[in-house]
Amino acid sequence: MVSPGLDLELSFSQAMQGFGLSPEVARLLWLPLPMLLVLVAAVVGVLVSVWLERKISAAVQQRVGPEYAGALGVLQPLADGLKLLVKEDIIPARADSILFTLGPILVVVPVIVSWLIIPFGQNLLISNVGVGIFLWIAFSSVQPIGLLMSGYASNNKYSLLGGLRAAAQSISYEIPLALAVLAIVMMSNSLSTVDIVNQQTGAGILSWNIWRQPVGFLIFWICALAECERLPFDLPEAEEELVAGYQTEYAGMKFALFYLAGYINLVLSAVLVSVLYLGGWGFPIPVEWLADWLHQPIDAPVVQVITGSVGIMMTILKAYLLVFIAILLRWTTPRVRIDQLLDLGWKFLLPLALVNLLVTAALKLAFPVAFGG
């Protein structure tokens, strides 16, 4: 657990100066680290998630799965990407070519931009803005426009139905998701993702928001799965009903963009759950214990470098545990009907999220120390 009063960037600089580097060189070495980490995490996250999807689905269906492209098939996602890259880019004769091309871009760009506010460590993020969570909700609201645009521009009835379903589903689940996040913001007194994690670093695992917001956690996770269009909520691209939904007429790299956006969004949602409810980079034990074991002061560079590195691994570990659960759900649960999907969002999750928000406000007034008063 990194103490909120300590600066990982400063500790890194001090550690580099201990090796004889000047402060300016240490600063230059630090600058690319947050951006590099985010880019690597997004790309590797997609590759690992696709590989996990293939292997877990094979295990559920008692198959071997990918095994020839690298050891245990780890290079299969790269092979899939190269295959889509070299395929012909086809635009249907009667499709609106401009909207047809713009649709996938509007779907994938907001997801990638959302990684700007994701913290992997105390200062390991690209943009620590004060309204980080608000920005993420705003970016995610752009996606339904791209999905509806893709379905409409394809000039295909299955694509149009898929686009309409995607837009309806996204709008239905964005509201309870935002209300669940608002309860966390209320307890943290901040919209910054860094502040939200720091608020969970008082007593190790017992400080995590999941214990104070179990209902909000379930609401957020269900809504996140619906936003990612994962089973049992993959109505927009239900193969048995709509061929491939809004993706029906797409091929090559345009289809790959939808594929990419889906998996980046899945990993992003898992990391956000880790940040909002599972303590983010926080380690389950207090940092003081590690400092005592190393016989170092709590603000020693070596202590902060170790806790920072472990914190990054903790964030990724928590996120991939949730990715594993999402993949397992896809291959073990049946798809719901569209009316059941909308009823769950509007008639159950939305009222439950409102009640959870009101209860959180009451608890904040009654127990200000425990609930961030």
Swiss-Prot record:
GO terms for molecular function: NADH dehydrogenase activity; oxidoreductase activity, acting on NAD(P)H, quinone or similar compound as acceptor; quinone binding. NDH-1 is composed of at least 11 different subunits. It is found in: Cellular thylakoid membrane. Belongs to the complex I subunit 1 family. Pfam families: NADHdh. It comes from the Bacteria. It catalyses: a plastoquinone + NADH + (n+1) H(+)(in) = a plastoquinol + NAD(+) + n H(+)(out); a plastoquinone + NADPH + (n+1) H(+)(in) = a plastoquinol + NADP(+) + n H(+)(out). One of its GO terms (cellular component) is plasma membrane-derived thylakoid membrane. Its main location: membrane. NCBIfam families: PRK06076.1-2, PRK06076.1-5. The lineage of its organism: Bacteria, Bacillati, Cyanobacteriota, Cyanophyceae, Synechococcales. Its EC number is 7.1.1.-. NDH-1 shuttles electrons from an unknown electron donor, via FMN and iron-sulfur (Fe-S) centers, to quinones in the respiratory and/or the photosynthetic chain. The immediate electron acceptor for the enzyme in this species is believed to be plastoquinone. Couples the redox reaction to proton translocation, and thus conserves the redox energy in a proton gradient. GO terms for biological process: aerobic respiration; photosynthesis, light reaction. This is NAD(P)H-quinone oxidoreductase subunit 1. HAMAP family: NDH1_NuoH (MF_01350). It is an enzyme of class 7 (translocase). It is a multi-pass membrane protein. The chain crosses the membrane at residues 28-48, 98-118, 129-149, 167-187, 205-225, 267-287, 309-329, 348-368. The keyword GTP-binding does not apply. Keywords: Membrane, NAD, NADP, Plastoquinone, Quinone, Thylakoid, Translocase, Transmembrane, Transmembrane helix. PANTHER family: NADH DEHYDROGENASE SUBUNIT 1, NADH-UBIQUINONE OXIDOREDUCTASE CHAIN 1.
